[in-house]
Amino acid sequence: MLKKRIIPCLDVKDGRVVKGINFVNLTDVGDPVDAAKAYYEAGCDELVFLDITATHEERDTTVEMVRRVAEQVFIPFTVGGGIRTVEDMKRMLQAGADKVAVNSSALANPQLLADCAEKFGSQCVVLAVDAKKEADGSWHVYLAGGRKDSGRDLLDWVQEAVSLGAGEILLTSMDKDGTKSGFDLPMLEAVSQVVSVPIIASGGAGSSQHILEVFEKTAATGALAASIFHYGQVSIAETKKAMQAAGLEVRI
């Protein structure tokens, strides 16, 4: 059985962490390496860096950031945002990222998943999906940070993506994102019924109880959150103790 993973998410722009992290005495709250080290020491299992840098020219700062993080942090980390080509993915992996997440570029060009998986292996390729529930009860995949309906059915898309070579799914509920009311359990369960790759739950975490709940009630193997970790509202160590007490497989 796969161990359950707690995964903080950091937004980076121009090689700097955008949202301040207040849960530890960081000398430089905007430094991704300091933030990553602090999370590593706090006991997280993996990290996700989401690059919200706007232009292609500025990506060199991201590559440099990845290199610095890889030198000093010894847990797996994923980099996502702005990955459009096999070459983009290659640069991130060569710099030291363990996995690379693709989102809208995979929707625009599904073959990208197959090309990347063939070159680097499925274990490096993470499909990031933003989804929202529709009036008919189905879920649609959204683009542009959840602002634009792609028209694609979520369950169809994840099955296609996995068949092409995606080795993991980072699934964000746009309905739950930012609400702190708990993860979208029905959506996670629906996706886990149609694919067999690991799923990271994202969107809605507001407490350690929500993290416990997503692992007890769905097949998700990872729980991702940002602000509850950044602002020290939830202790990773305490959450893991609760998970262990509940009989879940976890790295202490």
UniProtKB/Swiss-Prot annotation:
CDD domains: HisF. It is an enzyme of class 4 (lyase). The gene is hisF. PANTHER family: IMIDAZOLE GLYCEROL PHOSPHATE SYNTHASE HISHF (PTHR21235:SF2), IMIDAZOLE GLYCEROL PHOSPHATE SYNTHASE SUBUNIT HISF/H IGP SYNTHASE SUBUNIT HISF/H (PTHR21235). Belongs to the HisA/HisF family. GO terms for molecular function: imidazoleglycerol-phosphate synthase activity; lyase activity. It comes from the Bacteria. HAMAP family: HisF (MF_01013). GO terms for biological process: L-histidine biosynthetic process. It holds the Pfam family His_biosynth. Heterodimer of HisH and HisF. Its EC number is 4.3.2.10. Keywords: Amino-acid biosynthesis, Cytoplasm, Histidine biosynthesis, Lyase. This is Imidazole glycerol phosphate synthase subunit HisF. Signal peptide: none annotated. Pathway: Amino-acid biosynthesis; L-histidine biosynthesis; L-histidine from 5-phospho-alpha-D-ribose 1-diphosphate: step 5/9. The active site is at residues 11, 130.
